[in-house]
Amino acid sequence: MLEQQRSPSDALTVSVLNSQSQVTNKPLRDSVKQALRNYLSQLDGQDVNDLYELVLAEVEHPMLDMIMQYTRGNQTRAATMLGINRGTLRKKLKKYGMG
């Protein structure tokens, strides 16, 4: 039996209510893009120095929280699922006060 290959981004969706009041799924990247569009429009021409870190923290913290719940705190399994070294995971957990 052949397994169907899915792009990891296919599964990262956000449920939204469309103009016909129907719930649909859209890629997470679309929500991130909209959030950035909103943020940049509020800057009113001002520069910002830490946008990358700001966006990364907004995504990374809840991702780490959810993966640690999913793995029931198993850091080795969580690191494997994230595709990072366990030491790197421990640093990130410490950064967000999660470990």
UniProtKB/Swiss-Prot annotation:
Which domain of life does this protein belong to? Bacteria
Q: Name one GO molecular function term.
A: sequence-specific DNA binding
- Which keywords does the record carry? Activator, DNA-binding, Transcription, Transcription regulation
InterPro entries for the chain = Fis_DNA-bd, Homeodomain-like_sf, HTH_Fis, Trans_regulatory_Fis
Q: Which residues cross the membrane?
A: none
- In this entry, the residue ranges of the DNA-binding region are 75-94
Return the annotated region ranges for Disordered: 1-24
Task: Give the matching Pfam families.
Answer: HTH_8
Known partners and oligomeric status:
Homodimer.
- Explain the purpose of this protein: Activates ribosomal RNA transcription. Plays a direct role in upstream activation of rRNA promoters.
Q: Which NCBIfam families match?
A: PRK00430.1 (NF001659)
The UniProt family comment states: Belongs to the transcriptional regulatory Fis family.
Protein name as annotated: DNA-binding protein Fis
